[in-house]
Amino acid sequence: MKKPADLGGRAKNDLARLQKSGGSARARRALSYVRDNSFSPMESGLALSFGMPLRHGGFNLGNVTMNPSIKIRANKNTQGDSRFITRRPDILIEAKGRDGIVRRVAIDYDSSSFHAGQVDIVRDIERRNEFAALPNFTHFSLASPQVHDFNQYQQTAIRIRRALGKRDDPSRKAGEAQADFEARRTAIWYKQFALWSEVVRPSEF
C-alpha cells in the first residue's frame, strides 16, 4: 500500500513561496485550509477547492479529510463471522444536509482513467459497489476531463453538493433583488475559477 507523501506540507511550502513572491491573496488565504495526508498535488488542490469557503473561491462543500481509512462490511468468512475490508478514498467530504442527515461523499481521482482499460473500469465499478453498501454514502470517480475543464469541474461540484443533501450555494437571499443575486453569483464564479486555476488546473497527478 502506498504511503501518503507529506504533500500537505509541500502545498504549504508552495503557497508560502507564492506569498513571498507577491502571489495572490487567494493562495495566501489557502494556507490555513491545507489538509495533511495527501498522496498527490492534485488531491491537495481538490481538497482546497472543494473545502474552502465561497468568499475565498472554494465550493464550501463540507468537512474535508484526505485518504481516511473506511471500514466496509464484506462477505462473511468460512466460520460465519463478519469480514471487513478497508478502503481509502483520496478525499472524503462530510456534511449535514438540509434534512439534518449527515452524508459522506468519497472522491477518487485517476489521471489515467480517461484512457482506462477493462481492468481499470472493473476496479472502479467494484470500488463504487463497495461504498454503495454504506448508508448515506456516495462515491465519485474523477478523471482528467472533470478537473481540467472548469465547466465540467463546476458541474461535478454541484453534483457532490446535491449528493450531500445541501442547498444550492450561493442561493438567493430573502428580499434580495434578482440582479443583485446574479451579480453576487457571478463574483463567486470568478473567485472559484481563479482558485481552481491556481491549485487544481496546474496539477496532472
Describe each PLM feature range:
Residues 2-205:
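Surface segments flanking catalytic/ligand-binding clefts of nucleic-acid enzymes
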